[in-house]
Structures are given as C-alpha cells and as structure tokens.
Amino acid sequence: MSALEETQSLCKQVDDICNNGMESVEQCNKLLDQLSKIPMSIEIIQKTNIGIKVNMMRKKVTDDAVAKRAKNIIKDWKNVVDGKSKSQDDGGAPPAKKHRKESVEEAKPEKKKIEAPYKRPEPSSRPEIVAQFASASFPPKHLENDETRLKSAQLLLSALRFGDMPQGTLDPEELAVQIEEKLYSVHRDTNKSYSAAVRSRIFNLRDKKNLALRENVLTGVVRAEKFATMTSEEMASAEIREMRDKFTKEAILEHQMSVQQGTPSDMFKCGKCGKKNCTYTQLQTRSSDEPMTTFVFCLECGNRWKFC
C-alpha cells in the first residue's frame, strides 16, 4: 500500500472519530502512531486534507496528552509545507536528487556554492495547503467558548500577520494569545475599555507609518505583555511623537505669552470687543526662515489671539 493510500485509509478512521464520537485514547494514539510513520509529502497533504481532519480530531478528544501529540504532528506537517523539514533542507528536492546535485558540484569546483538565506513562503503560495494548518494550534481551548475574546485574538493575529514577516519572527499565534490574555487580565472583563484597548493595538500594528512597532513585537524586542499595557503615546511612531511634542511646546509657549506683559499698542483691534487697547509679543516659534508669531492680548476683555 502506498503512502497516499495508507493516508486515505487513516483519514476515514479519523472521520469516524470526528463524526460519530467513537474516540478513545487508545484508538487515537494508534492512529497517530500510524500517521507519524508515513513519509508525508505536500501532495499527500493536499489530496487528503489530513491536516484539517487531524486538527478536528484534536479538538474533539478530551485527553490533553492526545491533543498535544496531534498538535505536534500537525506542526511537523506544516514544516513540510513550509519547506523546513529535515528531509527537505535543500529546498524540497528528494534525497536522491540531492546526492546527484552534490556530485555535479564536486565535479565543478570552480563554481562556488552560495547558499541562499531562508525565505519565508508567501501566504498565498499554497493557499489550499496552508489553510489546513491555519488553526492547528490556534485558538487555544480556553478561548473557544468566549466569542468576544476569541474574536479579539483572531483580529490581533491578523494584525500581526499584516505585511512581510521580519527575520527572527516569533510564533504570531502565541503572541496574539499572550497579548489578549494580558489585556483581559488588565481590564478584568470584555468591557468597553477592553474592546478599546484591542482596537488601539490592532490599529497601531496595521499602521504602515509605524512598521517598527509591529516588527519589535514580532521579534520580541517589545514583549507581548508589555505591548498589551503600552499607552497610545508609547505605541505611536517617531513622527507622531515629534508632532505631539511640537504641539505641546507651542501650547505651553502660547499660554506663557498670554500671561506675560507685552508691548502696549493700538495697532490691533480686538475681534471680540472692538477695542484697540492691546499688548503684543513676538516670538520665533518656527524655523528661522519663517515669519515670527505675534501674540496679542486685549486689556479690555481678556481676549487672546495670535497670527504670523
């Protein structure tokens, strides 16, 4: 019996467990034993949908050890799809071809072999296969019965996966769960403040002008627990922080100028009371090649205004 035929046969047994509830620890372990011995390939995974079926069985079983074992097997298959399994270190070529390739290279020593760095497969490269593993370990069981928390974790995961993945990326699924759990712990419920905090983090992770934040979270520079408690100011990009600092300084300066005694003048007419009993002060609030800002204070009604 070929590996494909054996996998198809085992798929039927997995379907029986999922559809009829005929699971037992012994039966599940036996199935997993047989599946782990099959030399799985992308073709088999694609034709049999074995990843989806075993993942469904994982969610059905009540034994944690069996569920964990199924999860590990699914991860091994995911590695096959991603081209990271030990049998495919050369990019997916079979061992025999690899041997022939090495022989050819040995016969041509003048050509220096340059090993290309690992490139993460694009999400759309094999959508029909990758979809089988999208929920292999996500979401965790403790979120499956809470619709709000589950949706929050899914949205956070989507935001973490928004765009290219940097080198050294941690597991986005685990990060999404850790962020959600910390948010829930801080707000102690799925209330309005919890929802607002989730939305704020999703917005900042998806902000194309703040790519450094998402990269820092994915690579662990900013820990998931820390990210969950960061303020809007802390999450903001450098450009936004500079703008906020500028506006704050201008507001402070304007307030200070308004309470300081300026130069008396009747050149300015108050737009509020119509009188010309005013004082003014001029300061360079912008770059040196820009006009100075004039701060005017009406001594009659207390109205303040400025112009350049």
Curated annotation (Swiss-Prot):
Keywords: DNA-binding, Metal-binding, Nucleus, Transcription, Transcription regulation, Zinc, Zinc-finger. One of its GO terms (molecular function) is zinc ion binding. Residues 102-125 have a biased composition (Basic and acidic residues). The keyword Nucleus applies. Belongs to the TFS-II family. GO terms for biological process: regulation of transcription by RNA polymerase II; transcription elongation by RNA polymerase II. A zinc finger (TFIIS-type) spans 266-306. Residues 5-84 form the TFIIS N-terminal domain. Pfam families: Med26, TFIIS_M, Zn_ribbon_TFIIS. Zn(2+) binds at residues 270, 273, 298, 301. The lineage of its organism: Eukaryota, Metazoa, Ecdysozoa, Nematoda, Chromadorea. Residues 82-126 are annotated as: Disordered. This is Putative transcription elongation factor S-II. It comes from Caenorhabditis elegans.
